[in-house]
Amino acid sequence: MSDIHVTPVFADAAPCASPAPEKINLLDLDRRQMREFFVQMGEKPFRADQIMKWIYHYCCDDFDAMTDINKVLRARLKQVAEIRAPEVAVEQRSSDGTIKWALQVGDQRVETVYIPEDDRATLCVSSQVGCALECKFCSTAQQGFNRNLRVSEIIGQVWRAAKIIGAQKVTGNRPITNVVMMGMGEPLLNLTNVIPAMEIMLDDFGFGLSKRRVTLSTSGVVPALDKLGDTIDVALAISLHAPNDTIRDEIVPINRKYNIDMFLGSVRRYLEKSNANQGRVTVEYVMLDHINDGTEHAHQLAECLKDTPCKINLIPWNPFPGAPFGRSSNSRIDRFSKVLMEYGFTVIVRKTRGDDIDAACGQLAGEVIDRTKRTLKKQAAGEPINVREV
């Protein structure tokens, strides 16, 4: 939202017959836009800083509770603005402490996952309703695509989770320390809204997270990745998942447009501009049984990544109904990992979290009204359908 138009409304304004204008959701505004909003109201820019602290430091959505704001301004704000985050439609709790929320965004739902650990708590955030990329091993991709999320619907996931976790301090839940843009959708296909949302995550008057604790994961939209590097500095993770173009063309179809060499070239350009990544990118590699998990694939991957400073995150595949894959055995993952380590790579095998509530990597689905008609096309072709699609 580049231009903000506010018609100041005073508490004693006379009623009129025309319908009231739609209120501005302050969660849609970054700090620059928030200051512009208050200037247009005839207020000093510092009011934006005050309001943002209430919204993000205290998870406050009630203007009347903002005690250092004078009553006249509070009354005016209630007439022209609101603080509205997505509401929780369904909450599920895993036996390992992971929490998944299905959040209502209009007439659909997206999923957000809170993952507590001993030394941190990570929130996995969605950027789109559904996903257009059709990665074959991902549940979200099978739902089709509807629309991009607004800034308020992205940062609102963090706000809603922080409010819930903050209200549960007596349970010992750890406050959110990290945010990963790894939920539903491809973040680089929604840069217009993802960048302002991440700026609020980083802003001292927002959530105040370190740029090393905000991570964007992408499947390889190369022009958008180049643009990201010119706009904001956050940690980067790449969804590679294959050691060569032949396999990646099949399981990550965007590779047919931006192949591995193009993708890794863009990654290296990003690293040259970034401080958040400390000189290396996280490579995500889902382990699919007898598809991409052989020792020959490990050698190919090492050769593929030899010029890209990275650490490699091996992800045991998390199943969903109708998927034509199997999870690699622990022994195959172990052999694969050892080959990479012999080349000098840092390798981490991701611990599966929340799989008992379909909250693990690749399992998020939500409720998507598919504008791509992907489910109908699959029915017509006689292909298996994820049971969560219908």
Curated annotation (Swiss-Prot):
The keyword Methyltransferase applies. The keyword Disulfide bond applies. Binds 1 [4Fe-4S] cluster. The cluster is coordinated with 3 cysteines and an exchangeable S-adenosyl-L-methionine. S-adenosyl-L-methionine binds at residues 185-186, 217, 239-241, 318. [4Fe-4S] cluster binds at residues 131, 135, 138. It catalyses: adenosine(2503) in 23S rRNA + 2 reduced [2Fe-2S]-[ferredoxin] + 2 S-adenosyl-L-methionine = 2-methyladenosine(2503) in 23S rRNA + 5'-deoxyadenosine + L-methionine + 2 oxidized [2Fe-2S]-[ferredoxin] + S-adenosyl-L-homocysteine; adenosine(37) in tRNA + 2 reduced [2Fe-2S]-[ferredoxin] + 2 S-adenosyl-L-methionine = 2-methyladenosine(37) in tRNA + 5'-deoxyadenosine + L-methionine + 2 oxidized [2Fe-2S]-[ferredoxin] + S-adenosyl-L-homocysteine. It comes from the Bacteria. It is found in: Cytoplasm. Disulfide bonds join 124-361. One of its GO terms (cellular component) is cytoplasm. Belongs to the radical SAM superfamily. RlmN family. Specifically methylates position 2 of adenine 2503 in 23S rRNA and position 2 of adenine 37 in tRNAs. m2A2503 modification seems to play a crucial role in the proofreading step occurring at the peptidyl transferase center and thus would serve to optimize ribosomal fidelity. This is Dual-specificity RNA methyltransferase RlmN. It comes from Edwardsiella ictaluri (strain 93-146). The gene is rlmN.
